[in-house]
């Protein structure tokens, strides 16, 4: 959904009626809301999901603290949670559905020295929650920036995720957190920091299917693709029809590639919320150069394409210039095991446990800090 999806309709209605007109639809950026109200003459903007992501959004706007707003991702996690188990959840607000913990927080028995390893969504949330609870925090990130979520740079429809990532990273940098970029955890660093607890948010690596040709020159990982990536030829086969595979397929089709999504199961995108899945399936349906093949198991890759078998064992060929591997993520278990030797109070969050979406990662980071010292 585009920001202000219904704004044009509301502005036109306002021209013909004297009664107040209210519009709604993916509004969350204060400057754009103010500009729309001024230009259109519409009387009011209503917000729903933006206030789930940040219930204090109006107060922050009034006080000029726009940079502190937690932006809504428009991911539908709030709606999907209600449909799934009748409990509302939010990808960026770990308190939603657990409001009693916000107004009556579990007390911190003792302020401790925490070492958070990894600056993705789980690590950033852990650092924010730790500061709120009065702990001393050192956040170590091996790359040159906080935020993770590099795949969000690959597609226009990931703009909300990029905004969340960048604003959350800025929020962490503004807190009394000792942030160390381009840094790995060593014996010397642990001896210097002397952590009482370690929270490992070290993420996961893309996993390649164990089939012949999986390491060929025409194979790239979906999580590592860049926008208009020059490595991608015209005809593309995406191996894996989960959320990442489907979204990569959609974006590649929009760039003009001929794309086939190859999935072993009978349905696509089973790993995302119901509302988001409906949107993804709709995008696949309307994309003219995007095709799907479910119920096929990849058996090999070569320079001409992909070999697969159907449920009956019949072999089928899918020609391709480029194969995009979206077969899943593998937690960095070796790194987790290495870090666990440094501290007896040790927590693992986010993709380092298993493949996670943003909402699960932020809740992991929050929960780990709340459990420190209990």
Predicted regions and their residues:
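Short, hinge-like loop/turn segments at secondary-structure boundaries
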Residues: 1-3, 40, 62-65, 155-159, ...
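Rossmann-like dinucleotide/flavin-binding elements
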Residues: 31, 37, 108-140, 180-194, ...
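Well-formed, non-transmembrane alpha-helical positions, independent of function
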Residues: 12, 35-36, 60, 171, ...
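A short helix-to-beta-strand connector/capping loop
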Residues: 41, 172-178, 215-218, 284-291, ...
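Local beta-strand N-terminus motif with an aromatic residue
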Residues: 42, 172, 195-196, 320-321
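Helix-enriched interaction subdomains in cytosolic or periplasmic regions
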Residues: 73-86, 195-206, 210-211
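Flavin-dependent oxidoreductase catalytic cores
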Residues: 1-117, 121, 125-132, 136-137, ...
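Rossmann-like dinucleotide-binding cores of NAD(P)H-dependent redox enzymes
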Residues: 139-175, 227, 251-296, 353
């Amino acid at each position: 959904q585009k920001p202000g999806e219904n704004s044009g309709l509301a502005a036109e209605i306002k021209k013909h009626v004297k009664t107040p007109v209210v519009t709604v639809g993916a509004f969350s950026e204060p400057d754009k809301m103010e500009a729309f109200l001024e230009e259109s003459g519409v009387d009011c903007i209503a917000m729903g999901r933006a206030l789930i992501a940040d219930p204090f959004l109006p107060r922050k706007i009034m006080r000029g603290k726009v940079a502190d707003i937690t932006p809504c991702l428009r991911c539908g996690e709030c709606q999907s949670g209600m449909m799934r188990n009748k409990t509302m959840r939010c990808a960026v607000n770990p308190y939603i559905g657990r409001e009693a913990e916000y107004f009556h927080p579990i007390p911190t028995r003792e302020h401790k020295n925490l070492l958070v390893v990894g600056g993705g969504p789980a690590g950033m949330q852990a650092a924010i929650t730790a500061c709120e609870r009065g702990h001393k925090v050192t956040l170590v990130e091996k790359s040159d920036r906080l935020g993770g979520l590099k795949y969000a740079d690959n597609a226009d429809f990931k703009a909300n995720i990029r905004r969340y990532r960048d604003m959350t990273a800025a929020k962490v940098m503004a807190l009394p957190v000792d942030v160390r970029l381009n840094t790995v955890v060593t014996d010397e660093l642990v001896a210097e920091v002397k952590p009482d607890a370690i929270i490992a948010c070290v993420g996961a690596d893309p996993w390649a299917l164990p089939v012949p040709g999986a390491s060929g020159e025409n194979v790239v990982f979906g999580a590592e693709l860049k926008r208009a990536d020059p490595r991608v030829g015209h005809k593309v086969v995406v191996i894996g029809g989960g959320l990442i595979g489907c979204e990569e397929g959609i974006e590649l089709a929009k760039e003009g590639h001929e794309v086939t999504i190859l999935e072993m199961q009978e349905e696509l995108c089973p790993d995302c919320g119901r509302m988001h899945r409906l949107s993804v399936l709709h995008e696949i349906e309307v994309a003219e150069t995007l095709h799907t093949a479910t119920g096929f198991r990849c058996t090999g890759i070569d320079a001409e394409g992909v070999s697969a078998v159907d449920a009956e064992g019949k072999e089928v060929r899918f020609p391709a210039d480029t194969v995009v591997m979206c077969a899943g993520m593998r937690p960095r278990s070796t790194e987790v095991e290495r870090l666990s030797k440094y501290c007896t109070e040790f927590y693992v969050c986010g993709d380092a446990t298993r493949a996670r979406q943003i909402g699960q990662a932020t809740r992991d980071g929050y929960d780990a800090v709340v459990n420190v010292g209990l």
